[in-house]
C-alpha cells in the first residue's frame, strides 16, 4: 500500500519497485547475514512519486535496532527520488547484520 511498503531482501539481494503513488514508509527487510543489496525504484508513466521515510527490518520483521531502524544515507540526508515519469533511481545498501545498520547511497536519474 502507499503508506507502508516492504522490500524483502531475505531471498534475493536485488529488487525492483515501480512507484504508482507516494510512499510514507519504505522498509528494507534484510536476512540474518550482512551483505550488499540493491533496489531499483522506477517511476510509472505518470511520475511525481517519492518516499518520505526509509526504514529497516531485521530478518524476523522487527525494526532494525541500529539508528532506531532508520537508513543511514551518504552525506547524512536521505535521497529524494527522481520524479520524472519513466525514470529510475538505484539504491545500493550495505546491511551490517551484527549492528542492524543499513548504509545507503543512491544513483539517480536513469
What positions do the PLM features span?
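Acidic, glycine/polar-enriched metal-coordinating patches/loops
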Residues: 17-110
